[in-house]
Amino acid sequence: MALFKINKGEIMNFVNSTQLKTDIPNFDSGDTIIVHNRIVEGKKSRIQKFEGVVLRRRGSGSSETVIVRKESSGIGVEQSFNIHSPLVEKIEVIKYGKVRRAYISYMRNRSGKSARIKELNKQ
């Protein structure tokens, strides 16, 4: 007979909350951000910047992810980042955009002027 009942969910929440970053800026889909990502190649490591529009921010806690899309040489490039990963050094918000959806997948079919997003003046 067990004297104490162990709640595994509470233990997992406690462990996850200790590993969360506190310097994450407030951003949503449609915003333009720069993600400073640490890349390890052999014994060397460097920081690579990835600037683009946030297509989706999803999840909560330590499993929160963001999909960022940019257009490089006329080709669309998307990359998914775990926000609280130790490989993500810093996230900067460049512009705040106004969109009406949480997941703006329709941006994948657009390029040029049709891919513009209305800018918000947030401070």
UniProtKB/Swiss-Prot annotation:
Coiled-coil stretches: none
Species lineage: Bacteria, Bacillati, Mycoplasmatota, Mycoplasmoidales, Mycoplasmoidaceae
Single GO term (MF): structural constituent of ribosome
One Gene Ontology biological process: translation
Pfam family, one: Ribosomal_L19
The family this protein is said to belong to: Belongs to the bacterial ribosomal protein bL19 family.
Entry keywords, A to Z: Ribonucleoprotein, Ribosomal protein
Gene3D superfamilies, A to Z: 2.30.30.790
Superkingdom, taxonomy of origin: Bacteria
Function noted in UniProt: This protein is located at the 30S-50S ribosomal subunit interface and may play a role in the structure and function of the aminoacyl-tRNA binding site.
Protein known as: Large ribosomal subunit protein bL19
Organism annotation: Ureaplasma parvum serovar 3 (strain ATCC 700970)
InterPro entries found in the cross-reference section: Ribosomal_bL19, Ribosomal_bL19_CS, Ribosomal_bL19_sf, Translation_prot_SH3-like_sf
One term under GO cellular component: cytosolic large ribosomal subunit
PROSITE patterns: RIBOSOMAL_L19
